[in-house]
């Protein structure tokens, strides 16, 4: 027992039992993460890499600018270069807060060359004239552009530019639709696309909303559908297109026509009766048209023309010019006998000899029990031969000729 436990095979088995396990981690759990977008992750990594490159270039540019002359600079610019010359890195919060005072005072004294870290974000109007051939300053301006995820101030500027003076004849509903953000026209996510060609930032000022803003719901009865009102007013339904003016304009035309008809009727009293009769007929026709399905079917059956067939009838009279070609083969007495006999209903020809013949049906012998199988034993066949013997002779005696009779066997000579 001890030897068995001390063997290397047992030790290996014990080690396998201790190290045995099952990995149950789900390797597809990353596919269930629907909140994060892989493209956003890639863009974020690219943005971080660009920021690192921009910081490196900005530090190099600050060091190169600090070594040059410092005369004719604004206090803000001097402080900025002094901080850069000291070797201390500017934080992202300071970079965002510094462009504000510089933007408020663009005409500051001695504002010839500003600090490279204090460049503000270019505006829409300035972006078209932006030149890339300005050396390190152009690179810094490109570095200071905000990422696509950050909030963009041109949305608020657009709302401030569109004032009531620009839309003097708008309605409250139009103002509500105008204040709403545009759907599908870019925004904080896709605003940077195509801005180099005067993209959505410039197109907003050319045409405010190119979709039409549901103008089809605000048309009542104007010139765009005037033809449609004339066509549909004859129905006089609830949903006919048109306004109250159209109905008021159409209705007075009918009363104006009635007095003319009355004057004509007064001028010609003799023509009153013919004029009234067609009106009564029209009323009757309208009443007849209102009927049920059964009444309509009955009316159709009555008005339907009946088919007339030319049916040829057999002639019962014998023509006078008829000639007997040959006499009938049937006899009258045979026909009478057939009618008298109940068992025969068919006619018999004159040369029928079936009634004169005597037909006898012989009784076949019952087969023996042994012959039921056919192949069993031989007793059945023997009995059958014995039974057939005498009966066959009796039958043959009636039919076979007599050799001694000269009538049956006449002489050959």
Curated annotation (Swiss-Prot):
Q: What is this protein called?
A: Intracellular hyaluronan-binding protein 4
Q: Coiled-coil regions in this chain?
A: 40-64
Q: Which organism is it from?
A: Homo sapiens
Can you state the subunit structure given in the record?
Associates with ribosomes; promoting ribosome stabilization. Interacts with EEF2/eEF2; promoting ribosome stabilization. Interacts with FMR1. Interacts with FXR1 and FXR2. Interacts with CHD3 (via C-terminus). Interacts (via C-terminus) with RACK1. Interacts with p53/TP53. Interacts (via N-terminus) with SRSF9; this interaction is direct. Interacts with SYNCRIP; this interaction is direct. Interacts with MEF2C (via N-terminus); this interaction decreases DNA-binding activity of MEF2C in myocardial cells in response to mechanical stress. Interacts with PRMT1 (via N-terminus).
Describe, from its UniProt entry, the tissues in which this protein is expressed: Highly expressed in brain, heart, and kidney, and moderately expressed in skeletal muscle. Also expressed in a variety of tumor cell lines and in activated but not resting leukocytes.
> Per the record, where are the segments of Low complexity compositional bias?
62-82
Per UniProt, location of the Glycyl lysine isopeptide (Lys-Gly) (interchain with G-Cter in SUMO1) cross-link in this chain? 213, 276, 336
**Composition skew (Acidic residues), residue ranges:** 404-413
């Amino acid at each position: 027992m001890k030897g068995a436990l001390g063997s290397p095979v047992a030790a290996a088995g014990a080690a396998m039992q201790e190290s045995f396990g099952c990995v149950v981690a789900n390797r597809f759990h990353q596919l269930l993460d629907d909140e994060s977008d892989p493209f956003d992750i890639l863009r974020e990594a690219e943005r971080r890499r660009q920021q690192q490159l921009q910081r490196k270039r900005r530090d190099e540019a600050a060091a190169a600018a600090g070594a040059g002359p410092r005369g004719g600079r604004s206090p803000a610019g001097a402080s900025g270069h002094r901080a850069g010359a000291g070797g201390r890195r500017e934080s992202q919060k300071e970079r965002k807060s510094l462009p504000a005072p510089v933007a408020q005072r663009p005409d500051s004294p001695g504002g010839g060359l500003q600090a490279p870290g204090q460049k503000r974000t270019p505006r829409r109007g300035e972006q078209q004239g932006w030149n890339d051939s300005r050396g390190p300053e152009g690179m810094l301006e490109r570095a200071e552009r905000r990422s696509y995820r950050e909030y963009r101030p041109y949305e608020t500027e657009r709302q401030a530019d569109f004032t009531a003076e620009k839309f003097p004849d708008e309605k409250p509903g139009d103002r509500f639709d105008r204040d709403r953000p545009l759907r599908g026209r870019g925004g904080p996510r896709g605003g940077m696309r195509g801005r180099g060609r005067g993209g959505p930032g410039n197109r907003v000022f050319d045409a405010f909303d190119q979709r039409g803003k549901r103008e089809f719901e605000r048309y009542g009865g104007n010139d765009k559908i005037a033809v449609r009102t004339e066509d549909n007013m004859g129905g006089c339904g609830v949903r006919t297109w048109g306004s109250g003016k159209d109905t008021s304009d159409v209705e007075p035309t009918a009363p104006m026509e009635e007095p003319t008809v009355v004057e004509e009727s007064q001028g010609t009293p003799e023509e009153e009766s013919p004029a009234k009769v067609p009106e009564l007929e029209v009323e009757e026709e309208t009443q007849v048209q209102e009927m049920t399905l059964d009444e309509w079917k009955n009316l159709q059956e009555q008005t339907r023309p009946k088919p007339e067939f030319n049916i040829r009838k057999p002639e019962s009279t014998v023509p006078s010019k008829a000639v007997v070609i040959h006499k009938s083969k049937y006899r009258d007495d045979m026909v009478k006998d057939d009618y008298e006999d109940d068992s025969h209903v068919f006619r018999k020809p004159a040369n029928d000899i079936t009634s004169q013949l005597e037909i006898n049906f012989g009784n076949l012998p019952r087969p023996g029990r042994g012959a039921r199988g056919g192949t069993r034993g031989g007793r059945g066949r023997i009995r059958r031969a014995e039974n057939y013997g005498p009966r066959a002779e009796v039958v043959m005696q009636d039919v076979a000729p007599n050799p001694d009779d000269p009538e049956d066997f006449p002489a050959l000579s």
